[in-house]
Regions:
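Conserved glycine-rich "GG(E/T)P / GGGxP" loop and the immediately following alpha-helix
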Residues: 1-127
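Accessory C-terminal segments flanking Radical SAM cores
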Residues: 113-222
Length: 222
């Protein structure tokens, strides 16, 4: 919560906050996160993405009753999204904002590969990326995109302090300037070297396929 509070104190506005997983409703402090986001005048909209696999605990229902919040259910079918109808009934009963839809446009853009692109091609790929400004807060650090956050978390990339801003441990007096430099200061990320790109040209893939075992990952670590 310290990281989110520090971030909100250091920005002018946040048009959209997204709570993602895994499954965000498994996070035991989600009600505290929502309380912080909802009370901030800087935050315009909040989206919570759920896969409909679990029931929502009764103690967080009240925290969902805010006009800023929309809950988005991705329907992966009755076997996986087995609590979808329970959620829909609950959201209708409590008059909560929600949408429900099937998986949309899953592309081959999440695999970790050593793409061996030169700096010019990496810059063009980053410029064309549809998530190059979808900043991701993970474990107290703010990354430029979800891919950068995840390859670092998986230890496929040794992330220098240029790859993220340490929101939790930075001095508040310095954080706003750090964020400005981070947002506008780079032609591409180190994580781009492990990415296939995300510019809507990648092939569509079947959604929600699960691995039965871990697979080896390429690495840029020395």
């Amino acid at each position: 919560m310290i990281s989110l509070n520090n971030l909100l104190e250091s920005i002018d506005s946040l048009s959209e906050a997204r709570l993602l997983g895994g499954e965000p409703f498994l996070y035991p402090k989600i009600d505290k996160v929502l309380e912080l986001l909802c009370k901030s005048d800087k935050v315009s909209k909040i989206y919570i993405y759920t896969n409909g696999t679990i029931k929502i605990k009764s103690n967080i229902i009240d925290s969902l009753k805010n006009s800023k919040i929309t809950i988005e259910i991705t329907d992966y079918g009755e076997e996986l999204s087995r609590n979808k109808y329970n959620l829909i009934d609950l959201f209708n009963k409590e008059n909560l904002n929600y949408v429900c839809h099937e998986p949309q446009n899953w592309t081959d853009s999440a695999r970790i590969v050593d793409n061996k692109l030169d700096d010019d091609k990496l810059s063009k790929m980053f410029k064309a990326c549809c998530v190059n400004d979808v900043f991701t807060l993970l474990h107290g650090k703010l990354y430029h995109c979800p891919f950068s956050a995840n390859v670092t978390n998986l230890k496929a990339l040794f992330a220098s302090d240029k790859e993220y801003v340490d929101i939790k441990n930075s001095k508040k007096s310095e954080l706003k300037e750090k964020l400005k430099n981070f947002i506008f200061g780079r032609p591409f990320l180190e994580a781009c070297k492990l990415c296939l790109g995300r510019d809507f040209t990648q092939e569509l893939v079947e959604p929600a396929i699960q691995l039965r075992k871990n697979i080896p990952l390429p690495s840029l670590n020395s």
